[in-house]
From Swiss-Prot:
Gene3D superfamilies: DsrEFH-like. Pfam families: DsrE. It is found in: Cytoplasm. Transmembrane segments: none annotated. Part of a sulfur-relay system required for 2-thiolation of 5-methylaminomethyl-2-thiouridine (mnm(5)s(2)U) at tRNA wobble positions. This is Protein TusC. SUPFAM superfamilies: DsrEFH-like. Keywords: Cytoplasm, tRNA processing. The keyword Oxidoreductase does not apply. Heterohexamer, formed by a dimer of trimers. The hexameric TusBCD complex contains 2 copies each of TusB, TusC and TusD. The TusBCD complex interacts with TusE. Belongs to the DsrF/TusC family. The gene is tusC. Disulfide bonds: none annotated. One of its GO terms (cellular component) is cytoplasm.
Amino acid sequence: MKRVAFVFTQGPHGNAGGREGLDALLATSALSEDLGVFFIGDGVLQLLPGQQPEKILARNYIATFGVLPLYDVERCYLCQASLQERGLSQVTDWVLDAEVLAPDALGQLLAGYDAVMTF
């Protein structure tokens, strides 16, 4: 089976990218065990705790990221530079356990995947 990476680059709730990416990730997890999940740029905002999307009449799908380990999705990464740019370096209570890596390290990991899906 191919190694598939899912890259989240957009913030939550402004468009359907994050929700659609999560749906695709969950569907793919039933077919493959070799998945990686990367949060880069505004994508790091997907994992912020305490979001209140109902205030803008949006569906709260963020908590679903927290159940990814139940689907054997365990390789999750946050971009260190993206966190710093957004003043989030000190946040530790993400909705999903993810390893914080420098952009170069993320690039090396991504290069090892056969397919990369970006949302």
